């Protein structure tokens, strides 16, 4: 969707961007009144560990670079998954303990917890990212209705976070997507205005198991099936297979490309084999996040 130029981090990171496997606490959580209870500097308090996500993600690469750029020689970036990261954050917040995690926006954890990004004076994490819609070559000619809708699909971080929160709070992804579509009929009708229904044609969309992409992909599936009468199959894969699947035509498209940072490597390698329809969401952010009750404001503070 070349509406403008992203996965953001480099987000492609994605990211970001995020498994939905970890439970979130009930309701909005106020920041604890007691700050850091451990003794010593922030490094000692968190055992010189930054809790990361999936190895190889753009956000992880950016964080490895940050450790080098800020000369955090004693620090370790812990690999895992977005689900493991949010589980660790949830427990630390509940216990009012210090913790440093790799973070990105949009993400439900910023709505559930009072968090803040650490300032990045060296600009290691780059500027805000965008999430792009990517489709296979030939989709416009073979599936014009799907192409037209995917080209028009565009929403806000606030829209996405509503669906993410509903899923995190226990709704099935398809139920949360259907509820959002019903509540936002006017916007959805703008997306499909003037597009002919496909009446049972099949379409395959790929996505990564990040909270953000689970939300967006299920909303797109709901609109394609409810409004345009497609039969949509979703394929959950890792970032690499997602990009490769679209580039070789095994998958029709995705709405999960974090650019220009998170998925930068994939875009550079496969950009001439796919069609970029441009951003479907702007305003994403990557960086290191901490609970607001921690007395720390910048990545440079980690050296103290």
Predicted segments with their positions:
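A conserved helix-loop-strand patch within extracytoplasmic ligand-binding domains
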Residues: 31-51, 136-138, 148, 154-157, ...
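Immediate post-signal peptide segment of exported/extracytoplasmic ligand-binding proteins
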Residues: 24-47, 182-205, 301-304
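Periplasmic-binding protein-like
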Residues: 110-151, 278-287
């Amino acid at each position: 969707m070349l509406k403008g130029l992203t996965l953001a981090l480099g987000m492609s990171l994605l990211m970001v961007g995020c498994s939905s496997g970890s439970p979130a606490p009930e309701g909005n959580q106020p920041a604890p009144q007691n700050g850091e209870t451990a003794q010593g500097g922030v490094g000692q308090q968190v055992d010189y560990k930054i809790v990361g996500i999936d190895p190889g993600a753009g956000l992880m690469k950016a964080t490895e670079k940050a450790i080098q750029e800020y000369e955090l020689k004693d620090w370790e970036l812990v690999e895992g998954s977005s689900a493991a990261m949010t589980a660790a954050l949830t427990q630390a917040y509940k216990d009012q303990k210090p913790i440093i995690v790799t973070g990105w926006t949009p993400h439900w954890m910023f709505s559930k917890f009072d968090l803040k990004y650490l300032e990045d004076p060296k600009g290691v994490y780059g500027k805000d990212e965008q999430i792009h819609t990517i489709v296979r070559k030939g989709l416009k000619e073979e599936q014009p209705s799907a192409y037209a809708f995917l080209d028009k699909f565009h929403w806000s971080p606030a829209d996405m976070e509503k669906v993410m929160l509903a899923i995190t709070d226990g709704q099935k992804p398809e139920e949360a997507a259907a509820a959002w579509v019903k509540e936002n009929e006017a916007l959805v009708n703008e997306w499909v205005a003037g597009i002919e229904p496909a009446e049972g044609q099949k379409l395959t969309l790929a996505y990564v198991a990040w909270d953000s992409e689970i939300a967006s992909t299920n909303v797109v599936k709901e609109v394609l099936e409810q409004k345009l009468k497609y039969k949509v199959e979703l394929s959950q894969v890792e970032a690499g297979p997602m990009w490769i699947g679209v580039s070789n035509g095994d998958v029709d498209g995705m709405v999960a490309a974090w650019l220009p940072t998170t998925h930068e490597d994939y875009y550079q390698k496969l950009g001439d084999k796919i069609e970029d329809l441009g951003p479907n969401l702007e305003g994403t952010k990557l960086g290191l996040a901490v609970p607001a009750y921690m007395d720390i404001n910048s990545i440079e503070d980690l050296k103290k």
